[in-house]
């Protein structure tokens, strides 16, 4: 029996990296019967007589798992966020940040397509950048978007980490990876003028060695609907609200209608981004109305 990490999942095959070699395996039939689905990043036990034919036997306990993208045991996520074509959506960005916070994964925000902004639009974006930096999120922003300053900073952050690239279709995840490691030569797609959405140029999830990091390039998405938490848990995944919660009058304050709420007071005085609070209210309503089908 061998131990390794699932590097790629495609059409029922699982490529496992172990001892400097890559082994192609299939999962045993009892995986499906038990409702177990191996994902990229899983630490596993397997058996193989050669590198072409093997069987995946056991998935070891995960420290975390993302649903979109489907990847496990992640240290850090780079949220590639387009500011144009498609236009910047702080709602979509905050959905991804909440998902990462809920799994204990450190986010890095990378703004792409900054070269398409007018000077006035770039000034407006700087306010957004500063807002997220005040929360404590690392934000990489440069015009042009893939300048050496931003790329150099990102390389330092990624060193020694298992990383996932996530973001809306067409945001530039594969383009960013190509700049980090030009020899990858990943396929990239332009935005469909009809839909204003990118073609899904990445169709599989795979872990790639980029410098001293293992990076998952994952398929993009056009929406992000997953909230695997309760309304009581949601405020914990907004760091600026979590920091103020002890100052609220009521323990378990949801920062909506409660009196003497420190979060609403901070909002009133411009210490919390209006867009963040508006998105929080929307997420709260969505969670309150969704069916409780998440798993702890």
Swiss-Prot record:
It is found in: Cytoplasm. Binds 1 zinc ion per subunit. GO terms for biological process: ribosomal small subunit biogenesis. Keywords: Cytoplasm, GTP-binding, Hydrolase, Metal-binding, Nucleotide-binding, Ribosome biogenesis, RNA-binding, rRNA-binding, Zinc. GTP binds at residues 112-115, 167-175. The keyword Ion transport does not apply. SUPFAM superfamilies: Nucleic acid-binding proteins, P-loop containing nucleoside triphosphate hydrolases. PROSITE patterns: ENGC_GTPASE, G_CP. GO terms for cellular component: cytoplasm. It holds the Pfam family RsgA_GTPase. Residues 63-224 form the CP-type G domain. One of several proteins that assist in the late maturation steps of the functional core of the 30S ribosomal subunit. Helps release RbfA from mature subunits. May play a role in the assembly of ribosomal proteins into the subunit. Circularly permuted GTPase that catalyzes slow GTP hydrolysis, GTPase activity is stimulated by the 30S ribosomal subunit. This is Small ribosomal subunit biogenesis GTPase RsgA.
């Amino acid at each position: 029996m061998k131990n390794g990490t699932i590097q790629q999942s495609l059409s029922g095959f699982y490529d496992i990296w172990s001892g400097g070699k890559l082994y192609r395996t299939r999962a045993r039939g009892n995986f499906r019967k038990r409702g177990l689905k191996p994902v990229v990043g899983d630490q596993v036990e397997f058996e193989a007589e050669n590198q072409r034919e093997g069987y995946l036997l056991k998935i070891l306990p995960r420290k975390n798992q993302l649903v979109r993208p489907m990847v496990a045991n992640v240290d850090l996520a780079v949220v590639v966020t387009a500011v144009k074509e498609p236009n910047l959506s702080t709602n979509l960005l905050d959905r991804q940040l909440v998902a990462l916070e809920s799994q204990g994964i450190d986010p890095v925000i990378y703004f792409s397509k900054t070269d398409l902004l007018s000077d006035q639009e770039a000034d407006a974006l700087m306010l957004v950048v500063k807002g997220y930096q005040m929360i404590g999120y690392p934000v990489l922003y440069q015009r042009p978007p893939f300048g050496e300053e931003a790329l150099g900073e990102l390389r330092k952050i990624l060193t020694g980490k298992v990383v996932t690239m996530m973001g809306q279709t067409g945001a530039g995840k594969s383009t960013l990876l190509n700049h980090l490691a030009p020899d990858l030569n990943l396929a990239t797609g332009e935005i469909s003028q009809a839909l204003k959405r990118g073609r899904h140029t990445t169709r599989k999830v795979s872990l790639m060695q980029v410098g001293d990091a293992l990076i998952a390039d994952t398929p993009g998405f056009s929406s992000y609907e997953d909230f695997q938490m309760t309304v009581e848990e949601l405020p914990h995944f907004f760091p600026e609200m979590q920091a103020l919660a002890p100052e609220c009058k009521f323990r378990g304050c949801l920062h909506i209608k409660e009196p003497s709420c420190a979060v609403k007071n901070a909002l009133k005085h411009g210490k919390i981004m209006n867009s963040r609070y508006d998105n929080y209210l929307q997420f709260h309503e969505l969670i309150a109305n969704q069916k409780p089908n998440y798993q702890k």
